[in-house]
């Protein structure tokens, strides 16, 4: 009775856990809907493992319940059962079967390990292979397109159907680079260079995250990977590489002056101007989110500029609580004007 009372308390929690599995959140942040060869391999092997575990569980529990029902002690049955001290056939069987199951799991695992470790460019792409240097900062991502000669922040663009090589670094603490829909995760470690490759099967926007606890705003260290058709990707690269023109609108041009006078250019590069202490702003006006998770609208942008610590604790962005409304409006107009795609 006591056991049943204890179980009845935890049973609702078990069902609650089952229901919570439906709270997946954003559909582009899941490994269960693969959009690339790496992610597909991970998904297929996960399904294979589940099938193997399910078959083993079914067989083991079936034998368990059959024996429990057939050979359980009955009332008045005091006879001592026949004592068995070994069965060679059974022992061989329950040794060979696990070996076979392990081989079934080991072969694709080893094959995939070598596939993931292959960092050579795709022969079909050759010299057009995209190389991206990824640097993890608290709490944002920097993407350097070394062959093209420019830097992007928070949003990383790749061409569809091509193997893209990533070189991973960390500026401060341990991070982990992960785009669930396209592949597995890999750590970025201070002082150590890691490599990986990803490929997208179709155009789309795929959410990425830091998958290693790195500080108070770790959960907000998100980014987006945008996969484009090759011609669109080339147009984006051309726009990012071009010299940034002065804004044509008066308000945005005033905002550019506010941007420079408040030393924003000292941290946020625009085109080839500025440094990479913070995310590059060359295409800021095209981003869907700011600070990794906030919708890119005027209200959120002003709140971020005035008090970034209230929105993302532990970041190094200075606050500008006393900036006038006129300067703030002009600065936001300037940031909105920073686009490279029509």
UniProtKB/Swiss-Prot annotation:
**Signal sequence residues:** 1-22
Does the keyword field hold Ribonucleoprotein? no
The protein's name: Cytochrome c oxidase subunit 2
The note on cofactor binding and number reads:
Binds a copper A center.
PANTHER family in UniProt: CYTOCHROME C OXIDASE SUBUNIT 2, CYTOCHROME C OXIDASE, SUBUNIT II
Binding-site list for Cu cation: 175, 210, 214, 218
Task: Provide the cofactor list for this protein.
Answer: Cu cation; heme c
Q: InterPro entries from the entry?
A: CcO_II (IPR045187), CcO_II-like_C (IPR002429), Copper_CuA (IPR001505), Cupredoxin (IPR008972), CuRO_CcO_Caa3_II (IPR034236), Cyt_c-like_dom (IPR009056), Cyt_c-like_dom_sf (IPR036909), Cyt_c_oxidase_su2 (IPR014222)
Q: Which organism is it from?
A: Alkalihalophilus pseudofirmus (strain ATCC BAA-2126 / JCM 17055 / OF4) (Bacillus pseudofirmus)
Residue ranges in the Cytoplasmic topological domain are 70-89
Give the GO cellular component terms, alphabetically.
plasma membrane
Name the protein family.
Belongs to the cytochrome c oxidase subunit 2 family.
